[in-house]
């Protein structure tokens, strides 16, 4: 294909949208946008307005009601009816989007709308529905990284999207050959929320032309916004559903409304089944002929989790049942179309209250069953089915049962539910970036071949548990974990789970960790959890303790660490606290390794969990479920889920991946070999050297295009290094990869310097640079051990009596500061340099370095505020008040800001506002740690 400019791509899209049924209109500025909105509003409400279009005052009143709202509030207004008082005191209800009859909305498209707020901006393609800009399309020419379009959207949203542009629901970005969509939000836009569109078979629809044909047809787009965008009430965000979620819901709705048959949805673990099942439940509960939608879960811990998730998507949508009598009441309450309960409670309700549920012998009911492969489902399903004669059953699972991994009674998922309505496999999810792939290691803990409990070649009399839990082996495994944990978890940036074969094994490992932990400079935070049996078998006297006693000790250790007060009488609360702890991964206050037998291996999602240690036998669905705890997408510093097996589960892993990805090619799911990544590194390193042969030559680059080439080349190199570090054989030496760590740190310093320069220029100047929208992927560069706390620890160790040693300490700190990659540390770099150069030499052994540094920072902060206030002729105390508010709220108080700036010309006012906001944000970060 010949070279195609961005302008040509935009024009081609405008022509295509016109052919699809959009009215092409010319709107160049905000006034024309408002005029067009007003005209359409009057046309759509002609009957309600009784031939009297909105007057200027009435329209202004309306704008006052709908303008200046958050994106979240604007999304709610869009889907609601708004009462407007007319000049004659009558009231009329206005609507902005027909969410049921999608094709009855008015569809328009325009391009090159110009706005000027703090910065000038011109938007590529704007789709208007009923006059409101609901979809914004940003384009880049072919060959440009699509992430640049994403970063441009982020910049525009921060600087320019005001007024009616607050009603944008969705962004579409494309470079012609790659296209993504994502929802608008008040919070930070995340790359992980950019989605591909696909067909029903999960084949990507990438080109802009085919994307527009499939996704942007007027009725389809209105349907997507109306039905398949979710207003998350808890987090106050907008969520766009992914294509496979949409297709699954459509297939399930069709099966439920057009047939009497059952079905199941196979969507891989971590792909968002809860949202899919909620949307299906919600739509079905609105059907007149369906009397009740009952969402069944199998376990108590998942019950509360599902309820919490459902209520996020529609506040108050779920009435959780606490006991069977309440469940019976809710089943008979016609005002409750949707109920979430457990299958155990449902079975009990039928057994004890069948006469109260007579109506459901004939009424149409839909059951939606989460994780429908659960072992208890089979028997209880038969009982429920006997009572609900006119019911349909729809299952959701990430790991269905097939003949090779059928349930205990020999049945498969298809035997219970019938046809599979939609599939989205683990290979699809990894390909789309919705979950991560796996890096799997197999550590042989025996000198000879690895032992397997089911190995028929072993003499039957051998006590395999005795072999697996031999003191020497347990210590070997524990030491391997301790020695490698920081590498696997990026210096404890992430947490891990260690799954073992039995409660006895768990106790033994916990005690070994506890003993070895005492010798570590930085001890690991270890926790253990299991369910004890009140009347426990003592295994013929082999184990001289009751497991409850050991759990009590683990809980006591946990209480000391986290200042809690749990016991074996409050194990549910202990479980919930651990769950929140592992999910949040709060820095310096989190669990590093959670030891379990089976708990937390299914139905538990944590983005900050990246490593699973395995010392037990796993197969098929159990293996995939366990591995999948590690593969939730977080940020660039988490490129895969790390699995460390202390048993030879290679065959089991390959078999499970073959079954659940429906392919023999597992390369798309598992990381490639070390040699492949090493070759990739060599190629990237050569490319970097061709652009800038040495790190210091980056300083000589004048041309922005050349600087951009350097950024892109080093960014690729850094990504490969991140993957290489996951391999035990990796050594950061010239002999191994042709580059040593020092050279990498030097290149990284230059890379971060370019990032800081671009960030500063963006904040201070109304200037557009080609580097503004480059994705620097800063999170990938961070080494969390080298931060402000790390430097402060070195400062505390400075020998104030031995001047020669003091100079060595100072030089060490300077070297570290030169290569700082922690954002806050880079902000403090000059402060710390000045402190060690000017203050430290004057201190003696009686001085408190911590206090001296606090005093030094306080003086510098005071001077910085005084200087900024004097330079801009603003009140210093008012500036400090704004800064203090920002420190606690994260928001610059607009009322205080307006008062402080005073009466300035509009352009000057914007400049002053921007400068103050930047100053407050930077000084808060600089002096806030």
Curated annotation (Swiss-Prot):
Coiled coil: none annotated. Keywords: ATP-binding, DNA-binding, Endonuclease, Hydrolase, Nuclease, Nucleotide-binding, Restriction system. Residues 254-418 form the Helicase ATP-binding domain. This is Type I restriction enzyme SauMSSORF170P endonuclease subunit. CDD domains: DEXHc_RE_I_HsdR, HsdR_N, SF2_C_EcoR124I-like. Type I restriction and modification enzymes are complex, multifunctional systems which require ATP, S-adenosyl methionine and magnesium as cofactors and, in addition to their endonucleolytic and methylase activities, are potent DNA-dependent ATPases. Belongs to the HsdR family. ATP binds at residues 268-274. GO terms for biological process: DNA restriction-modification system. It comes from the Bacteria. It catalyses: Endonucleolytic cleavage of DNA to give random double-stranded fragments with terminal 5'-phosphates, ATP is simultaneously hydrolyzed. GO terms for molecular function: ATP binding; DNA binding; type I site-specific deoxyribonuclease activity. The type I restriction/modification system is composed of three polypeptides R, M and S. It is an enzyme of class 3 (hydrolase). Its EC number is 3.1.21.3. The keyword Nucleotide-binding applies. The restriction (R) subunit of a type I restriction enzyme that recognizes an undetermined sequence and cleaves a random distance away. Subunit R is required for both nuclease and ATPase activities, but not for modification. After locating a non-methylated recognition site, the enzyme complex serves as a molecular motor that translocates DNA in an ATP-dependent manner until a collision occurs that triggers cleavage. SUPFAM superfamilies: P-loop containing nucleoside triphosphate hydrolases. SMART domains: DEXDc.
């Amino acid at each position: 294909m010949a070279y195609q400019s961005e302008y040509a791509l935009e024009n081609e899209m405008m022509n295509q949208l016109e052919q699809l049924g959009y009215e092409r209109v010319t709107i160049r500025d905000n006034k024309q946008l408002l005029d067009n909105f007003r005209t359409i509003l009057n046309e759509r409400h002609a009957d309600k307005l009784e031939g009297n279009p909105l007057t200027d005052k009435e329209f202004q009143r309306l704008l006052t009601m709908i303008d200046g709202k958050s994106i979240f509030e604007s999304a709610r207004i869009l889907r609601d009816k708004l009462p407007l008082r007319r000049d004659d005191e009558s009231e009329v209800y206005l609507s902005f989007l027909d969410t049921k009859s999608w094709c009855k909305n008015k569809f328009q498209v325009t391009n090159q709308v110009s706005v000027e707020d703090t910065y000038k901006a011109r938007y590529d393609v704007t789709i208007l529905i009923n006059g409101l800009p609901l979809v914004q399309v940003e384009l880049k020419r072919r060959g440009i990284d699509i992430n640049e379009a994403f970063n441009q959207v982020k910049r525009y949203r921060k600087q320019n999207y005001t007024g009616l542009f607050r009603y944008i629901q969705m962004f579409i970005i494309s470079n012609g050959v790659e296209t993504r969509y994502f929802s608008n939000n008040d919070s930070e836009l995340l790359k992980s929320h950019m989605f591909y569109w696909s067909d029903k078979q999960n084949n990507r629809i990438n080109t802009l032309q085919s994307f527009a044909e499939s996704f942007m047809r007027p009725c389809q787009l209105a349907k997507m916004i109306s039905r398949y965008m979710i207003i998350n009430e808890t987090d106050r965000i907008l969520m766009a559903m992914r294509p496979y979620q949409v297709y699954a819901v459509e297939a399930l709705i069709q099966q439920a409304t057009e047939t009497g048959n059952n079905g199941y949805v196979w969507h891989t673990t971590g792909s968002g089944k809860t949202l899919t099942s909620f949307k299906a439940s919600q739509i079905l509960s609105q059907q007149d002929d369906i009397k009740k939608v009952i969402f069944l879960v199998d376990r108590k811990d998942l019950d509360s989790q599902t309820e919490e998730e459902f209520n996020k998507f529609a506040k108050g949508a779920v009435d959780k049942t606490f006991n069977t009598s309440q469940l019976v009441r809710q089943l008979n309450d016609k005002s409750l179309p949707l109920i979430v309960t457990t299958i155990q409670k449902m079975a009990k309700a039928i057994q004890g209250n069948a006469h109260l549920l007579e109506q459901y012998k004939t009424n149409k009911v839909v059951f939606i069953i989460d994780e429908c492969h659960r072992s208890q489902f089979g028997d209880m399903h038969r009982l429920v089915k006997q009572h609900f004669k006119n019911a349909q059953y729809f299952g959701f699972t990430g790991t269905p049962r097939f003949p090779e991994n059928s349930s205990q009674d020999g049945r498969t998922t298809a035997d219970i539910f019938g046809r599979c309505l939609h599939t989205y496999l683990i290979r699809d999810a990894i390909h789309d970036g919705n979950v991560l792939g796996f890096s799997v290691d197999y550590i042989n803990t025996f000198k000879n071949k690895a032992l397997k409990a089911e190995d028929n070649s072993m003499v039957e009399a051998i006590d395999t548990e005795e072999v697996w839990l031999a003191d020497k082996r347990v210590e070997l495994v524990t030491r391997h974990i301790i020695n490698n944990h920081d590498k696997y978890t990026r210096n404890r940036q992430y947490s891990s789970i260690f799954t073992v074969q039995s409660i006895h094994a768990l106790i033994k490992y916990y005690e070994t960790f506890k003993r070895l932990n005492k010798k570590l400079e930085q001890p690991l935070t270890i926790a253990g959890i299991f369910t004890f049996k009140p009347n426990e078998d003592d295994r013929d006297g082999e184990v001289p303790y009751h497991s409850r006693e050991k759990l009590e000790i683990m809980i006591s250790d946990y209480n000391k660490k986290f200042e809690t007060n749990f016991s074996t009488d409050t194990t549910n609360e202990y479980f919930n606290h651990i769950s929140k702890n592992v999910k949040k991964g709060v820095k310096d206050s989190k669990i590093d390794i959670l030891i379990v037998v089976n708990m937390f291996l299914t139905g538990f999602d944590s983005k900050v969990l990246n490593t699973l240690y395995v010392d037990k036998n796993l197969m098929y669905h159990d293996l995939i479920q366990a591995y999948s705890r590690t593969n939730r997408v977080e940020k660039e510093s988490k490129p895969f889920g790390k699995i460390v097996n202390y048993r030879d589960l290679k065959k089991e892993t390959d078999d499970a991946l073959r079954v659940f990805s429906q392919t023999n090619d597992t390369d798309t799911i598992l990381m490639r070999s070390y040699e492949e990544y090493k070759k990739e590194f060599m190629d990237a390193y050569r490319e970097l050297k061709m652009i800038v042969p040495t790190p210091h030559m980056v300083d000589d680059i004048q041309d922005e295009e050349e600087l951009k080439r350097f950024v892109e080349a080093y960014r690729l190199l850094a990504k490969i290094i991140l993957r290489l570090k996951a391999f035990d054989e990796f050594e950061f030496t010239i002999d191994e990869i042709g580059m040593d760590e020092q050279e990498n740190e030097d290149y990284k310093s230059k890379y971060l310097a370019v990032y800081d320069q671009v960030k500063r220029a963006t904040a201070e100047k109304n200037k557009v640079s080609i580097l503004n929208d480059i994705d620097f992927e800063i999170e990938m560069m961070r080494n969390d051990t080298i931060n402000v706390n790390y430097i402060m620890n070195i400062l505390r160790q400075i020998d104030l009596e031995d001047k020669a040693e003091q100079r060595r300490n100072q030089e060490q700190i300077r070297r570290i500061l030169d290569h700082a990659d922690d954002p806050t540390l880079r902000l403090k770099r000059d402060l710390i340099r000045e402190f060690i150069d000017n203050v430290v030499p004057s201190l003696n052994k009686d001085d408190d370095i911590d206090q001296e540094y606090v005093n030094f920072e306080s003086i510098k902060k005071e001077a910085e505020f005084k200087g900024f206030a004097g330079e801009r002729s603003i009140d210093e105390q008012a500036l400090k008040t704004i800064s203090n508010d920002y420190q606690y709220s994260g928001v610059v108080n607009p009322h205080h800001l307006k008062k402080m700036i005073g009466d300035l010309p509009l352009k000057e006012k914007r400049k002053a506002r921007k400068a103050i906001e930047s100053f407050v944000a930077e000084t808060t970060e600089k002096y806030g740690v």
